[in-house]
């Protein structure tokens, strides 16, 4: 009998974008590749390609989805009633975290201190964040604890650094931090956890912490009130750390974040009594850098998803990527993402040494701005995919839920902006170094020149206003404008970097839209004359 072929048009799949994976996320990111070379990290290109291919693999996508679906479970007691405080984690979480540790993202600059060490790590951090943002929290804290210990507790650093920076996932150690309490949030002065001397250099901590991310960490830096005031302590996970519950969070659901009670926990002092904030701030500055890098990563991944979809999807008889309105949106996303990437790598390079004033100031400025821009960009990118981007099989819902976190972690928007204002007054060398970096592009674009002039005037007014009143007398007015002051500084650095290093089409579009006042408030309102085709082709080469 002859076989009759039956065609079922209902089941035929047409006009759908093919899977993005497998993809080498580093190979298709020209902005990151160029920035890595420029910032001294050319020696790490092979590592970045390997990480980019692994993060862009079908396996990474599978493990990320599984880790998000099978959320951590806290077991406070065993079957007999003994306190155990263990967190059950899906094997896919371990696959993702192991991938970050074995690539050295948690400590490579400390293992290999050389020029470009931090840019190489930043590139690897950006790429592996594409696999899963949740695992990057313990990775970031472990990286950040080392400089804090080296500076304020060198004897502890000597004991723990080999494990904190080692590449063996099973034998290594992870670090966390616990500052926030339920009554205080970002206001560490409100901390009520007590630290009482217990002899021979030990203290006992009693109190609670409202947020403690990643309870399986081996060690933690904890803030508590000692006899001489707020102090920083080194705590090894063990008896007395009683985890109460895991947070039911909007995003990073693969990451275990907890509430913990401290009941006679043994701890060692880091730094001096009463100097807790200066001791822990070195850790905070490095995790703030990772907030910046992580947000740049989310922006890039969302932009790639939008570009890939638009390149393969047609509507009204024409590919989306060829339609003028969509092309405007995609080009706008691309320039915003590239600006975030180049800023993240430039700031990361300052951590290699020799630029302490620029490093501290630029970290605060760019952490505020890039983390603030990420959620809106991701939302716009999701819209490019339409309904396909709104379903959980897409990568977009996960990126969207995770996007707001970095703007909250290590100080929300107002905290970050006010930190910049304080730095302008207390550490003016930081502002000077920051503006000097921006002015390396002076004379190259009239819009940037005008913007820099305004930024100089605005920041000068923070110190002494036109009416001659002092900083304290003008405190309300200055704080009221805090976000705009910091925004102008951030845009100045991004524009300067693009004018100096990006193709003319990218730099011109950015300066026109972000500095020249020629664009609207929504993405996709770039002015006429922008070379969108060139920008899009650069953002995701065919």
Where are these regions (language model features)?
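A short core secondary-structure module
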Residues: 202, 206-241
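C-terminal amphipathic alpha-helical interaction region
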Residues: 437-542
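C-terminal helix-coil-helix/basic helical segment that borders enzyme active sites and/or dimer interfaces
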Residues: 338-367, 382-383, 460-480, 486, ...
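Internal helix-loop-helix
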Residues: 78-172, 212-214, 337, 402, ...
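A glycine-rich, basic-preceded beta-loop-alpha segment at the flavin cofactor/substrate interface
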Residues: 259-287, 304-321, 428, 451-475
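Flexible, small-/acidic-enriched active-site or ligand-binding loops
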Residues: 240-264
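Extended, charge-enriched "interface" segments that sit outside catalytic cores
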Residues: 1-114
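Glycine-rich phosphate/cofactor-binding loops in nucleotide/flavin-utilizing enzymes
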Residues: 2-37, 43, 50, 72, ...
């Amino acid at each position: 009998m002859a076989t009759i072929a039956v065609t079922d048009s209902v089941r035929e799949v047409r006009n759908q974008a093919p899977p993005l994976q497998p993809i080498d996320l580093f190979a298709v990111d020209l902005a990151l590749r160029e920035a890595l070379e420029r910032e001294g990290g050319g020696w790490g290109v092979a590592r970045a390609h390997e990480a980019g291919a692994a993060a862009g693999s079908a396996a990474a996508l599978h493990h990320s989805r599984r880790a998000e679906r099978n959320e951590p479970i806290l077991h406070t007691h065993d079957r007999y009633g003994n306190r155990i405080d263990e967190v059950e984690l899906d094997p896919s979480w371990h696959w993702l975290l192991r991938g970050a540790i074995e690539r050295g993202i948690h400590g490579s600059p400390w293992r290999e201190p050389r020029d470009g060490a931090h840019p190489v790590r930043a590139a690897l951090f950006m790429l592996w964040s594409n696999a899963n943002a949740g695992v990057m929290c313990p990775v970031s804290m472990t990286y950040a604890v080392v400089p804090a210990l080296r500076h304020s507790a060198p004897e502890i650093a000597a004991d723990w650094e080999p494990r904190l920076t080692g590449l063996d996932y099973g034998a290594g150690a992870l670090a966390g931090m616990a500052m926030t309490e339920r009554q205080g949030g970002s206001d560490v002065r409100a901390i009520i956890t007590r630290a009482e001397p217990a002899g021979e250099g030990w203290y006992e901590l009693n109190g609670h912490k409202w947020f403690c991310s990643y309870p399986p960490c081996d060690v933690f830096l904890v803030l508590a009130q000692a006899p001489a005031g707020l102090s920083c302590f080194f705590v090894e996970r063990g008896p007395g750390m009683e985890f109460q519950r895991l947070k039911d969070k909007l995003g990073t659901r693969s990451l275990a974040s907890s509430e913990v009670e401290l009941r006679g926990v043994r701890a060692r002092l880091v730094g001096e009594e009463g100097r807790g904030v200066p001791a822990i701030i070195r850790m905070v500055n490095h995790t703030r850098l990772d907030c910046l890098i992580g947000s740049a990563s989310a922006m890039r991944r969302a932009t790639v998803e939008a570009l890939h979809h638009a390149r393969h999807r047609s509507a009204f008889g024409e590919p989306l990527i060829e339609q003028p309105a969509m092309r405007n949106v995609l080009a706008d996303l691309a320039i915003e993402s590239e600006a975030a990437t180049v800023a993240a790598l430039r700031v990361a390079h300052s951590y290699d040494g020799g630029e302490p004033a620029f490093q501290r100031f630029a970290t605060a400025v760019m952490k505020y701005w890039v983390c603030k821009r990420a959620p809106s960009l991701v939302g716009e990118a999701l819209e490019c995919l339409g309904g396909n981007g709104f379903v959980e099989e897409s990568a977009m819902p996960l990126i969207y839920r995770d996007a707001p976190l970095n703007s909250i972690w290590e100080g929300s928007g107002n905290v970050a902006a006010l930190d910049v204002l304080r730095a302008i007054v207390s550490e003016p060398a930081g502002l000077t170094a920051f503006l000097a970096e921006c002015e390396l592009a002076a004379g190259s674009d009239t819009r940037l020149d005008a913007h820099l002039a305004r930024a100089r005037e605005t920041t000068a007014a923070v110190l002494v206003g036109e009416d001659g009143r002092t900083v304290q007398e003008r405190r309300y007015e200055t704080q009221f404008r805090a976000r705009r002051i910091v925004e102008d500084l951030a845009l100045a650095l991004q524009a300067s970097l693009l004018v100096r290093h990006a193709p003319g089409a990218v730099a011109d579009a950015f300066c026109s839209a972000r500095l020249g006042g020629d664009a609207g408030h929504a993405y996709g309102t770039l002015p006429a004359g922008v070379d969108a085709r060139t920008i899009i082709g650069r953002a995701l080469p065919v």
